[in-house]
Amino acid sequence: MKVLQEMTAVRLLQLKAIKFQPKNPFTWGNGWTSPMYCDDRKILSYPKMRDFIRLELARVIAEMYPDADIVAGVATNAIAHGVLVAEQLSLPFIYVHPQPKDHGLENQIEGDLRPRQSVVVVENQVNTGVNLAKVIEAIRNNGCKVLGVVTIFDYGFSATKRKLEKMDVSLTPLTNFETVLRHASAMGVIDEEQKETIENWQQNPAKWEK
């Protein structure tokens, strides 16, 4: 996995899918300020990178979860990657909202999921894990087993790690915060002062101030 983590980190940085702005931080949807941002949606615009992610996520699932019956994407950002991976593995696909919709059929799970199926969840990136936890719970409430979660990038927040461990769910990222930051520094994308700032943020993102 280490070689894969290194390769994925370098490719994401070359694609400029991960941006760093310690002095002009981004605002996340949950209100946190962050000196970095993973724009993994850019991957979909570049066929070679898109194929790389598709093949590697599929390979991880095939090796770690050979008994998977179905692939579930976390709505909405992981739907595209989930579909690509399911197609590669010739597996059925569903996607799951963090909450049931308030219109139409009011579904939380979109597609056909039968009780007792074994599910692998595809997430585009893992940060707080709040929505991911809701998706896992919804799948389990449908009488199914969550084999594990695969993702492109993991921020590695300690609170998220504890949350997934408590839920007894394994997480396998193609790359992670430490690997990306190390390569960003080596490639001259960030300097040492910026690297230290970003590391401090990652230790306590909810209370970080620039």
Please provide the spans of the model-predicted regions.
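Short, glycine/charge-rich flexible loops or terminal/linker lids adjacent to PRPP-binding catalytic cores
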Residues: 81-120, 128-134, 187
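PRPP-dependent phosphoribosyltransferase catalytic core
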Residues: 2-15, 137-210
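Conserved acidic residues
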Residues: 69, 117, 147
